[in-house]
């Protein structure tokens, strides 16, 4: 079975519900969780159930649940997984923890070297075509001998940015002079459907 099939066919096990294992609620304090654990640990402790592998496995699950829910950092991570609706086990999700929530913006030339489980789309997307370099491509007045007001690779031409990124408005033909060259806040808000 492939990883994709495992995710599609995943059914959450009752053993992954740490709150249910300890017979407590999501709002239970660490003291309440500890008290519930003690009652259940006495019932399933390996010393009381010698040779019973099922009771030993249950005791290990209870111990893991207690350790996770009594540690505030681990509990926050567990609650994030529990409420996310992600179709993978908690242990599998923990194994991918360093990837979760990371958003990297890759340039066209950069390789994608890590998986990511972050589904939020970044505000700025990669360009379809890479930025062209060189003085000839930059246009007049932007060459290497320009004053400090010239454009450099660190400060690209604002006309090449999207309107949503605060770039200049697009124009075609000779209409540039009619609307004015300045980019006002009201015009930007209108273009971005904010008013």
Swiss-Prot record:
Alphabetized, the UniProt keywords read: Chaperone
Superkingdom assignment: Eukaryota
Example of a GO MF term: protein-folding chaperone binding
Bilayer-crossing regions: none
Under InterPro entries, the record lists:
DnaJ_domain, J_dom_sf, JDP1-like
J domain sequence ranges? 17-82
Tissue distribution: Expressed in the head.
* Name used for this protein in its record: J domain-containing protein
* Source organism (scientific name): Drosophila melanogaster
Q: Which gene encodes it?
A: jdp
